[in-house]
Each structure stands twice: as structure tokens, then as C-alpha cells.
Amino acid sequence: MIVQDSVCSELMRGCEEILPVPELEKKLQKGIPLKIKAGFDPTAPDLHLGHTVLLNKLRQFQQFGHEVIFLIGDFTAMIGDPTGKNVTRMPLSQETVLENAKTYQHQVFKILDPDKTTVAFNSQWLNKFNAVDLIRLAATHTVARMLERDDFNKRYTTGQPIAIHEFLYPLLQGYDSVALKADVELGGTDQKFNLLMGRELQKHYGFEPQVVMMTPLIEGLDGVKKMSKSLDNYIGINETSEQMFGKIMSVSDELMWRYIDLLSFKTGKEIQQLKQSVLEGKNPRDVKIDFAKEIVARFHDQTQAEFAHNKFIERFQKGNIPEDLEELSLVIAEPIALAQLLKQIDLTASTSESIRMVKQGAVKVDGDKISDPSLKLPIGKSYIIQVGKRRIAKLSIQQAH
């Protein structure tokens, strides 16, 4: 069976980098189910939409008849992935890892087809490693090769400690591909070193090397930094339908297209048609509403998507002030610029975001749109402050004594 070029194009769409492309095309042209691997270390209990960029790609492979292996790195999670870290990461307990792993499985099957997914745990083979096995694995690579990794290199050159077990992490992750005989491995762009390690180790052990497909790291709600729970710029897949809908509606039109490209189940052709319709006069807000409904329906259901949409209209588009409005208090010695104030009460992540939101006309005080980020609100009064479509609070500004 010859795989159509359109199938190859659809599978490659949205990937940041594929190494190497000709090998992927060759594997797909064989017309037999490939083993598609993606590993997740359950270091936190909840997934967010940033994680689903990769899960969506796995789902595509399932739709085209390939075998998806959802690998839970229960063994490697106890080491801790050093990728992007400037300090040694503290290992997690086995109990925490297993509890998080249970939550992961429940969440991923909101996207993946459980009947077409093999769930594996790398403790199945790594727990069997003895000292000889580990030394032989470590002997496949040099310290110089490990220091090619940007994060290791930075820590080494600045005198920050690197624990020996951190060097073992990419080797163990790479060995997972050997154990599973993976044909393709998916991961984020930040995982490039680890993904290529799997390819190198497969060659070393005499297997056909896997193709590496890297998906982009999606920006968070601020449109600047990658989506992360620690930065509070994320959309969790376990959030309520109203929270999810509101957060999606809060993103800029520019970021909306980025989200649609990476998160929608629409084909590339359908997305191009959407973009063309906006160029021809369709309101981007309507596209955003449809996208928000799609995402909410995926993680809840269509009824909840319609409910969230109606609540959103009732709360924001009709100008209603919600009954459960968050009440904030700020005590200051003298009035401060609105841009600084918004950051101080956590309605924005930074002063620069405050300025950007004001300039976009996304900030209202008592229902009036504000155009001056340096505006100073008088002390001794209360205000209804709204930033974007979802962040709204009642603020009381009091005089410091």
C-alpha cells in the first residue's frame, strides 16, 4: 500500500522539526502500522493544553492506523528530567509518581483512543537493570557528548553542580526507545537531545533508528512565555467548561490562530479556509467562539460547550457584573500608574503586559475603556476593573498610614 502524500503532509503539519524527513516518508510508505512512542514523566498531577499539542499528533497517527505507545516514565520521573533546569532537580517518591500516573491515564484518554493505545511504564525494563547493565549503557556516551546539551553546558561553565544521575536521565530515556523498538518518537522541542539519544542508542544496539518528530512549545495566555502552571498562564484540561471557555476567549486574535493551528482537530485545509473567511470580513471573535466550543466539547461535551458559551455572553458581552466577583484590596502611600497597579493585584503577569492590554483597549475601569497606562486611580475609592474577557475584580484602594 502506498501512503498518499496528503497523509504524510497532515502528519508532518504543525511539527517544529523532523529528523530526518526522508526516513519518516520511507517508513510511512511501507504501508504497515508503525510504533509511535511518546513519553511523559508524571511529575505533576494535571495536564494543560500545552501538553495536548503532542497528544493531538499521537491521535492523528492513530487515525491513520498506527500503534501509539503512551509511555509513562515512572522510573525516570524518580530521577527528574534536568532539561532546561539550572539546578539539580529533586527526585520524586514512588508513591507520588504512581498517583500522578493514574491521573495522567484518565486525562490522556480524553484525546487518545484507548483501544488503539498501549500504555507502558519504563519501570518494566529499567527496574531489571543491574550494575553491569547500567555501566554498559553509560559507556555508550562520553561526558563531552553530555556537555553538548545546552543546560548542562551552562551549568558546567558557570560552576553550578551537575549530579551524575542527571547524566543518566537522557541515556535511560533513550533506552526506552530500544526496549519498545520505536519507529517514531514524538516530543517537545526542548527534548531534542533526549530524543536523539534514543536514535543513537537504537543504532548502538543494532535496531533501525527511530525518526524524531518535535512539536512546538505553545505560548501561554500572555502570548509570550510557554504555557506553564508555575507561570499561571495555562488552560488546564480538567478545568470547568466556563473557565476553559473564558480563558480561550481572553487570548489575542494573533495567538488564537496559533492555538487553532496546534490544538484544533480541523485539517490544514479547513484552517486555511477559516483564515480566508476572516480576510473576507468574518469577525475573528466568531472564529474564537467556535474554537472555544470545540476545545470545551473535547474535554467536557457539546452541552457543556453551549452552556459555557451562554454564560460567557451573559457575563461579558451583555456587560453583567457577576455576583461572585472577586474582591481585592490594595494599600498604597500614593497613587500609582494603572499598568503597575494591574501587575500588583495580579490581573496581569507583568507591567509590560498591562501596557499592552491597555493599548489594545482591553482594560476597563467601572465600565469605561482606558487608553492611558499611566492613569492613576485616586486612593480611598473602590473600582470594578476588567482586563480582557475573563479577568474582572472589585478593587478597594486604601491609604497607607
From Swiss-Prot:
Binding site for ATP: K229
Motif placement: 'HIGH' region: 42-51
EC number: 6.1.1.1
Subcellular location: Cytoplasm
Broad class of the protein's primary localization: cytoplasm
Domain S4 RNA-binding: 336-397
Keyword terms, alphabetized: Aminoacyl-tRNA synthetase, ATP-binding, Cytoplasm, Ligase, Nucleotide-binding, Protein biosynthesis, RNA-binding
PROSITE patterns, per the entry: AA_TRNA_LIGASE_I, S4
Family annotation (Gene3D superfamilies): HUPs, RNA-binding S4 domain, Tyrosyl-Transfer RNA Synthetase
Keyword Protein transport in record: no
GO-annotated biological processes: tyrosyl-tRNA aminoacylation
Motif ('KMSKS' region): 226-230
NCBIfam families, alphabetized: tyrS (TIGR00234)
Its biological purpose: Catalyzes the attachment of tyrosine to tRNA(Tyr) in a two-step reaction: tyrosine is first activated by ATP to form Tyr-AMP and then transferred to the acceptor end of tRNA(Tyr).
Name of protein: Tyrosine--tRNA ligase
